[in-house]
C-alpha cells in the first residue's frame, strides 16, 4: 500500500518584474506599473488562477519590502513592524473647512481670561442642605423654580402698587423667562450676522 507524500511546490520568495514596484508602506500599498497580460481564454478557472498569481506577487513583494526596510521589534505579544508615514496624498471630496470666527462671547472670554466650565461645573445638580438631598438647578422641579407653586407668596406692597393692571406676581417669572428667551434669540441672530460678515471678508 503506497501513500502519496508529495507536497505542493513552494512559490518563489523573490518576484522579478520588468518595471519595479513602487511602495507606500504607510498605507501598506504596492503599485505594479506592469500591464496585466490576461490569457485569451474563456475558462474562468484559468483567469482566476492568473489573477491570483498577480495578486500573490504583489503581496509577496510588499512583505519583502516591509521586512527589509522597516524597524522590526520583538515583544511579548509578537513581532511588531513600525510603518513609516504615508506618502500618497489622498484626494478630498469637500474643501478644507474654514475655521469658524469667534463669537462675541468667545472673544470676550479670551480677553478676560475666562476658561470654559468643567464637566463638574456644568452638572445640573446641587446639594440642598435643608432637605439633605441632591436637586436639579434648573429644568423640571429645578431649584430656580422654588416658590413658584407655593399657595402663599410674600409680596411687596410698594411693588404691587406699581404693577401693571391685569398682571399678577405669579406671572412675573414666566414673563421674565419669555423676555430673556426673546433677547437671547435676538442676540444670537445678531452674532450670526456678524460672523457671516466676517467670513465674507476673508
Curated annotation (Swiss-Prot):
Entry keyword annotation includes Iron: no
Entry's Gene Ontology cellular component terms: nucleus
GO biological process: ribosome biogenesis
UniProt entry tagged with the keyword Nucleus: yes
Main localization, broad class: nucleus
Localization (cell): Nucleus
UniProt keyword list: Nucleus, Ribosome biogenesis
Coiled-coil residue windows: none
Matches recorded under InterPro entries: Ribosom_reg (IPR007023)
Pfam families (UniProt xref): RRS1
Region (Disordered): 82-103
Subunit and partners: Component of a hexameric 5S RNP precursor complex, composed of 5S RNA, RRS1, RPF2, RPL5, RPL11 and SYO1; this complex acts as a precursor for ribosome assembly.
General function of this protein: Involved in ribosomal large subunit assembly.
Family that this chain belongs to: Belongs to the RRS1 family.
Name of this protein: Ribosome biogenesis regulatory protein homolog
